[in-house]
A protein has these predicted regions:
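Glycine-rich FAD pyrophosphate-binding loop
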Residues: 11, 23-45
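N-terminal Rossmann-fold NAD(P) dinucleotide-binding loop
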Residues: 17-18
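Conserved N-terminal helical subregion
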Residues: 2-8, 50-138
Length: 138
C-alpha cells in the first residue's frame, strides 16, 4: 500500500471520517479512509444539526445540498395540557443519518477520495509509521 505512504490515514468511513476527508481534500492534503466493513452503513436515526455543525457544512458548500433532503424547522412550540405556552425560533436542520451520510459520501467521492473497505485496523506502529489490518494488507 505504498501508494498511500504520504497520506493521512482516516480510520472509519462514518460521518466524522468523511467530514475529515472532505476538509483535507479541499485543502489539497492527501488522505485515505480505511473502513472495516465491506460497505457503507445504511442504518441510523434522525438527527438535528445545530448552528456549529451548520457553519461547517456551509463553509464546505454542503449545507444547501443537505437542506434539500432535510426538514428545516424555524421554530419550536412548547405545550402544556394541549395549549401552546410559548414558541422560540430555532436554527437547526433535522435530517436522517442516511441523508447526511449520502451528502458527505457523494462529496468525498467527487473530490476523488479513496475508501478502502474490509480494512479493520489491528495495530499502529508509530516508529515505522505503518498500519496493520486484519486482512493482512499493510
Amino acid at each position: 500500500m505504498s501508494i498511500y505512504k504520504n497520506h493521512i490515514a482516516i480510520i472509519g468511513a462514518g460521518i466524522s471520517g468523511l467530514m475529515l476527508g472532505i476538509i483535507l481534500k479541499k485543502h489539497n492534503i492527501p488522505c485515505v479512509i480505511f473502513e472495516k466493513y465491506n460497505t457503507v452503513s445504511e442504518y441510523g436515526a434522525g438527527i438535528s444539526i445545530s448552528p456549529n455543525g451548520l457553519k461547517i457544512l456551509e463553509e464546505l458548500n454542503l449545507l444547501n445540498k443537505l437542506k434539500m433532503v432535510s426538514a428545516n424547522p424555524y421554530k419550536t412550540n412548547f405545550y402544556s395540557n394541549s395549549s401552546m405556552i410559548t414558541s422560540i425560533p430555532v436554527d437547526v436542520v433535522t435530517t436522517s443519518r442516511q441523508s447526511l451520510y449520502k451528502v458527505l459520501l457523494d462529496e468525498y467521492l467527487s473530490l476523488q477520495g479513496d475508501i478502502l473497505f474490509d480494512h479493520e485496523l489491528i495495530d499502529i506502529n508509530l516508529s515505522k509509521k505503518t498500519l496493520s489490518f486484519l486482512n493482512n494488507i499493510n
